[in-house]
């Protein structure tokens, strides 16, 4: 069925202008919604992760919020976040500190722990097997990690910056499905790539027709979601729109 999309959205977090109060956001980037409709948001310029219950006017700071810095109680331009249900913790990509950190969601938590450092991380995803997938936008690759593993396994890109099917150029956000297929917003190639498990190269599944605003094009894609039918939803940044690509569509 072709769902009818309402043209007017409903504000569920922020909306009170740019700022650092708990009813405000300042450059929100990645977000994650859990099974209870609780939302955690990487509030990038506020150097914090803020949690929002559906219907609340104010959020609650659950990581960072102690200014910009590299102490374990601070964050530095967090760009993506997810919830690890198994350990009831937040996993956060900190762009400014080039590290991935974990913060417990238990009350009383005042600092995080470093999982991986020296990584130009942007996007995070966790598969059903609790593997952590991280994009590195300087190495132009995506790696898969077991929690506690520092090196990981290459799963997409890793052949330098470029537009070949075995390359990426500034990979940002990720989505991983139940088959461990990795979808990547390949930002500067203006396309979304799909890498099947174990593949040596990816498949272009959205965009890839150069920078532009035609319906066949994307311009610096960011946020990404893939539903169970393989339909791709992507935030088309420079075109200021959200695009839906059905499986097999050109």
Task: State each model region's role.
Residues 47-50, 98-101, 140-143, 152, ...:
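Structural signal for beta-propeller blades
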């Amino acid at each position: 069925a072709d769902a009818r999309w309402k043209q007017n959205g409903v504000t569920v977090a922020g909306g009170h202008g740019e700022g650092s109060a708990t009813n405000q956001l300042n450059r929100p980037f990645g977000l994650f919604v859990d099974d209870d409709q609780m939302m955690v948001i990487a509030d990038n310029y506020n150097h914090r992760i803020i949690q929002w219950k559906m219907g609340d006017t104010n959020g609650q700071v659950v990581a960072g919020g102690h200014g910009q810095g590299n102490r374990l109680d601070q964050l530095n331009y967090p760009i993506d976040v997810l919830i690890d249900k198994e350990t009831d913790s937040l996993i956060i990509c900190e762009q400014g500190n080039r590290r991935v950190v974990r913060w417990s969601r238990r009350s009383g938590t005042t600092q995080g722990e470093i999982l991986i450092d020296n990584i130009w991380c942007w996007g995070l995803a966790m598969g059903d097997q609790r593997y952590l997938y991280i994009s590195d936008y300087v190495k132009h690759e995506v790696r898969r990690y077991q929690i506690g593993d520092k090196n990981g396994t290459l799963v997409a890109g890793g052949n330098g910056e470029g537009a070949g099917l075995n390359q990426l150029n500034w990979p940002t956000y990720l989505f991983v499905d139940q088959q461990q297929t990795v979808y990547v917003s390949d930002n500067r190639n203006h396309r979304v790539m799909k890498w099947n498990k174990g593949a040596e190269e990816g498949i272009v599944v959205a965009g890839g027709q150069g920078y532009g605003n035609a319906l066949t094009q994307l311009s610096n894609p960011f946020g990404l979601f893939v539903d169970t039918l393989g339909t791709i939803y992507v935030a088309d940044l420079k075109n200021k729109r959200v695009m839906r690509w059905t499986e097999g569509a050109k």
